[in-house]
Swiss-Prot record:
<dbReference type="Pfam" id="PF01138">
    <property type="entry name" value="RNase_PH"/>
</dbReference>
<dbReference type="GO" id="GO:0004654">
    <property type="term" value="F:polyribonucleotide nucleotidyltransferase activity"/>
</dbReference>
<keyword id="KW-0808">Transferase</keyword>
<dbReference type="InterPro" id="IPR036345">
    <property type="entry name" value="ExoRNase_PH_dom2_sf"/>
</dbReference>
<dbReference type="InterPro" id="IPR012340">
    <property type="entry name" value="NA-bd_OB-fold"/>
</dbReference>
<keyword id="KW-0963">Cytoplasm</keyword>
<dbReference type="InterPro" id="IPR015847">
    <property type="entry name" value="ExoRNase_PH_dom2"/>
</dbReference>
<feature type="domain" description="KH">
    <location>
        <begin position="560"/>
        <end position="619"/>
    </location>
</feature>
<dbReference type="InterPro" id="IPR020568">
    <property type="entry name" value="Ribosomal_Su5_D2-typ_SF"/>
</dbReference>
<dbReference type="GO" id="GO:0006396">
    <property type="term" value="P:RNA processing"/>
</dbReference>
<dbReference type="Pfam" id="PF03726">
    <property type="entry name" value="PNPase"/>
</dbReference>
<comment type="function">
    <text>Involved in mRNA degradation. Catalyzes the phosphorolysis of single-stranded polyribonucleotides processively in the 3'- to 5'-direction.</text>
</comment>
<dbReference type="Pfam" id="PF00013">
    <property type="entry name" value="KH_1"/>
</dbReference>
<dbReference type="GO" id="GO:0003723">
    <property type="term" value="F:RNA binding"/>
</dbReference>
<dbReference type="InterPro" id="IPR036612">
    <property type="entry name" value="KH_dom_type_1_sf"/>
</dbReference>
<feature type="binding site">
    <location>
        <position position="493"/>
    </location>
    <ligand>
        <name>Mg(2+)</name>
    </ligand>
</feature>
<dbReference type="InterPro" id="IPR004087">
    <property type="entry name" value="KH_dom"/>
</dbReference>
Amino acid sequence: MSLFNKVVKEFKWGQHTVRMETGEIARQASGAVLVDVEDTVVLATVVGAKTAKPGQDFFPLTVDYIEKTYSAGKIPGGFFRREGRPSEGETLISRLIDRPLRPLFPEGFYNEVQVVIHVMSINPEVPADIPALIGASAALAVSGLPFNGPVGAARVAYINNEYVLNPTRSQIKGSRLDLVVAGTERAVLMVESEADQLPEDVMLGAVVFGHEQMQTAIDAIHELVREGGKAEWEWQAAPKNEALISRVNEIAYNELLSAYQTRDKQARSTKLKEVYAATQAKLEEEAAAAGTVAADKASVGNVLFDIEAKIVRSQILNGEPRIDGRDTRTVRPIEIRTGVLPRTHGSALFTRGETQALVVATLGTKGDEQIIDALEGEYRDRFMLHYNMPPFATGETGRVGSPKRREIGHGRLAKRALAACLPSAEEFGYSIRVVSEITESNGSSSMASVCGGCLALMDAGVPMKAHVAGIAMGLILEGNKFAVLTDILGDEDHLGDMDFKVAGTADGVTALQMDIKIQGITKEIMQVALAQAKEGRMHILGKMTSAVSGVNTELSAYAPRMITIKINPEKIRDVIGKGGSVIRALTEETGTTIDISDDGVVTIASTSSEGMAEAKKRIENITAEVEVGQVYEGTVLKLLDFGAIVNLLPGKDGLLHISEIANERIKDINDYLKEGQQVKVKVIQTDEKGRVRLSAKALLNEAAQTEPTPQQ
């Protein structure tokens, strides 16, 4: 009898065969599934705590996606030769998996749940993110935890005007769209994408196509659960304290309603804190008088939050003004200023209502490109975008340090939005870093980073293909009534049912991110949201174009200038020198940065035009070929009995034979030449071994022939 109750399911999905198995590996986890997609293998495990911690008032879900270097047949770098902190790619995929899973746990479930996905084997052509998401969903489904799944996922490309399901990496490179969609049988929950200025109907079509195709994976997970799933947990949400809800409503409803008539965020936050504190104090006073125990702060806070949500949502659905007084379609007032920081290469201050981003663009050389050591192989990235949001942006105190998952995710979204409109490396050879410093935040700071990033790049002289703007949309849905909100506030994000971010140009969408908290979102609602987002985006683009009509034609005085020359690839070693001695001396003496590609393209960068010109001249001398018939001003390096060794160019010497020095016979060469002497010589012969023969006599004879003869 086998130790294992192994269950295997296989299905064809697009161009790939997918194999899912459970029951053999990691049997002590609550759920574990191994997913194999054409040799890309991931192990997804789930462990759920049987009870919640006392006083727990939120759902502690953690998702960790971990890439093992052995999966690609590699040994990790570094002193310890083992995997360390998560890479940016691992963090982004962890977020990608977390986002569709989190809304499917029932309200009131506060038991700790940990999802860990290990990449065990990697096929460079098959990305591991979709197998990881499918595996995490399957592991949750077989675990028996209270989970309203399973979740399916699919990647969609758009190649030759057709949608392609789960494309290979090679296909993605030739696609105008890279979109990941996740959802249940009935609804889309999450979309993450970047596109090459595609129209809204193509984007929506990709979402619908992906949702239809993921049903195959969902059906396979159902089959896996039927044969290998564990018993469902006997869990029920704690009954609601109706007496507490009723009393809190009596005490706080009108006060909360009044607070939400305050348009200013800071003033509103102050009033809300006062209502929370007063409500808690009133309940404690009543409990003391009755000789009972007062409800804890967390329970009271949850009830108050529900009342806030009810007030805000009902006001919007009833056609009343939003929290800050706007209607559903109005974008907040926008202010734009460029050239904000004097010594940076490009900068912009983008303010939309109470959200503000100070964005800075920096230009660098090829040596400044980010080198990414991915499982699929090392590659270089010439465009970096980093998003920072310090605590002061929301008027709070907090930890300042390395970026958190949210900051990494927001930076990647803004990067995707701008990437489609950047010039190619051939058109603009600089590496580019954009940093978005969020100085104020009240919703949609990632989209402010897109707008500010585009303006900062233009200020830096980067020839963008078009202006790029981004906008965040929200949704309130109750039964058959819904309202799509343009340019949402932070509170509307927390209290709403959808966070929907769209970035693009006047011609189309470049990035789309959607997170949906409920399962009633239809294609029609998404269509309305996309159309309303386009209207808002066009408004912002109009403001941006009015402020900055085009790219700054001159680079900042503090940005490096670049020139490019082509040399024979066989001469690269001469420019570099033994142990890098030649190129090191070149860069130090001329104050330049020099990059040499394998095909012989040399890029020289410096803030000094004189330094660049000197470096260019010296490289041309180093790589120049000695040509027969050419005349050179050489330096005598060494005297021999039969002639002299003369240096013509760096690394290029020739022999000046004693018979080629003068027309008369020479007895002692020292009478004519000295070491270190400058001498003009002509190349009269070279051979296949690179040996060069020189003549000074030939120049003397040529000079004599050109002298005018005396008139008779």
